[in-house]
Curated annotation (Swiss-Prot):
Name of the protein: ATP synthase epsilon chain
UniProt entry tagged with the keyword Phosphoprotein: no
Keywords, in A-Z order: ATP synthesis, Cell membrane, CF(1), Hydrogen ion transport, Ion transport, Membrane, Transport
Role of this protein: Produces ATP from ADP in the presence of a proton gradient across the membrane.
The organism's place on the tree of life at top rank: Bacteria
Localisation: Cell membrane
Its membrane topology: Peripheral membrane protein
Recorded family membership: Belongs to the ATPase epsilon chain family.
SUPFAM superfamilies in the record: Epsilon subunit of F1F0-ATP synthase N-terminal domain (SSF51344)
NCBIfam families: ATP_synt_epsi (TIGR01216), PRK00571.1-3 (NF001846)
HAMAP family linked: ATP_synth_epsil_bac (MF_00530)
One example GO MF annotation: ATP binding
Assembly behavior: F-type ATPases have 2 components, CF(1) - the catalytic core - and CF(0) - the membrane proton channel. CF(1) has five subunits: alpha(3), beta(3), gamma(1), delta(1), epsilon(1). CF(0) has three main subunits: a, b and c.
Length: 148
């Protein structure tokens, strides 16, 4: 059976290293499915889930919450470099829920302030940071609650 090697690397080191028969990722240009023999490519990733179907068991899928980064496909070797990445089994869903609630609260407060003071650009930065924090929390919750 044809296979690929998949590695997920963060500033904290190697987070994932397995052989796969299929990978699904979400890039800035949309969703991508990768099979062995895929053309070489480099693409920026969205904050989203990464699905890896393992070679050792076709029914086994590893889910990884990836917070942006890039994916490189070269000769059946897939490297994902991300600021952070967590496997579904490692995600503390209750912690992610709390992060989601904090981000939603900040977004609501900052959106009100921005509407009141539309000329302040620093408020827009706070809103953008809160939106990113919310996307990351939702991604972690989504991956952390996958049926195992």
């Amino acid at each position: 059976m044809a296979q690929m090697t998949v590695q997920v690397v963060t500033p904290d080191g190697l987070k994932y290293d397995h052989h796969a028969s299929f990978i699904h990722a979400v890039t800035k240009d949309g969703q991508i499915g990768i099979l062995p023999g895929h053309i070489n490519l480099i693409a920026p990733l969205e904050v989203d889930e990464l699905k890896v179907r393992r070679v050792d068991d076709e029914s086994h899928v590893d889910w990884i919450a990836v917070n942006g980064g890039i994916i490189e496909v070269k000769d059946d070797f897939i490297t994902i470099i991300a600021n952070s990445a967590e496997r579904d089994r490692d995600i503390d869903v209750s912690r992610a829920e709390r992060a989601k609630q904090r981000a939603e609260r900040v977004l609501e407060e900052e959106t009100k302030r921005v509407l009141e003071e539309a000329t302040k650009s620093d408020r827009n930065d706070d809103v953008q940071r809160a939106q990113i924090a919310l996307r990351r929390a939702l991604n972690r919750i989504n991956v952390g609650t996958k049926i195992r």
